[in-house]
Curated annotation (Swiss-Prot):
It comes from Homo sapiens. Keywords: Apoptosis, Chromosomal rearrangement, Cytoplasm, Hydrolase, Manganese, Mitochondrion, Nucleotide-binding, Nucleus, Phosphoprotein, Transcription, Transcription regulation, Transferase, Tumor suppressor. Changing Y145F: No effect on phosphorylation by SRC. This is Bis(5'-adenosyl)-triphosphatase. Substrate binds at H8, N27, Q83, G89, Q90, T91, V92, H98. PANTHER family: BIS(5'-ADENOSYL)-TRIPHOSPHATASE. It is linked to A chromosomal aberration involving FHIT has been found in a lymphoblastoid cell line established from a family with renal cell carcinoma and thyroid carcinoma. Translocation t(3;8)(p14.2;q24.1) with RNF139. Although the 3p14.2 breakpoint has been shown to interrupt FHIT in its 5-prime non-coding region, it is unlikely that FHIT is causally related to renal or other malignancies. Changing H96G: Total loss of catalytic activity. Rescuable with free imidazole. Changing Y114F: Loss of phosphorylation by SRC. Impairs induction of apoptosis. The lineage of its organism: Eukaryota, Metazoa, Chordata, Craniata, Vertebrata. Changing Y114D: Impairs induction of apoptosis. Reduces affinity for substrates. Residues 2-109 form the HIT domain.
Length: 147
């Protein structure tokens, strides 16, 4: 079974957690090691269109995923980001939360991560994507934490 993420079909091999209403997947072009996404299962374009139970599940799942990626990738902090609508930088028309484990000094300016996320979401060159094998291996390593 594949997962819908906006205009994309996501292979189960890159999904490391599925809850009743959400799923988490590795990123094909991470801004930092461990940069993952958490999405509602239902393809909803804007945050205000989520039902209350979907909001609760999305953020409970995001919290669980954040704890795992911070530990697995030896982070000391987390950045959570959501672009809600085109003027906010949303390029995939499906609500999603970026979860990024952080370390001291990972960016010259701490807030540069937001500039990198903006560039990340606009640059869509398959040549810069990770291989399916690399993504599947990372998803498998993260999946262990949720079994």
């Amino acid at each position: 079974m594949s997962f819908r993420f906006g205009q994309h079909l996501i292979k189960p091999s890159v999904v490391f957690l599925k809850t009743e209403l959400s799923f988490a997947l590795v990123n094909r072009k991470p801004v930092v090691p461990g940069h993952v996404l958490v999405c509602p299962l239902r393809p909803v374009e804007r945050f205000h269109d989520l039902r209350p139970d979907e909001v609760a599940d999305l953020f409970q799942t995001t919290q669980r995923v954040g704890t795992v990626v911070e530990k697995h990738f030896h982070g000391t902090s987390l950045t959570f980001s959501m672009q809600d609508g085109p003027e906010a930088g949303q390029t995939v028309k499906h609500v999603h939360v970026h979860v990024l484990p952080r370390k001291a000094g990972d960016f010259h300016r701490n807030d540069s991560i937001y500039e990198e996320l903006q560039k990340h979401d606009k640059e869509d060159f398959p040549a810069s994507w990770r291989s399916e094998e690399e993504m599947a291996a990372e998803a498998a390593a993260l999946r262990v934490y949720f079994q």
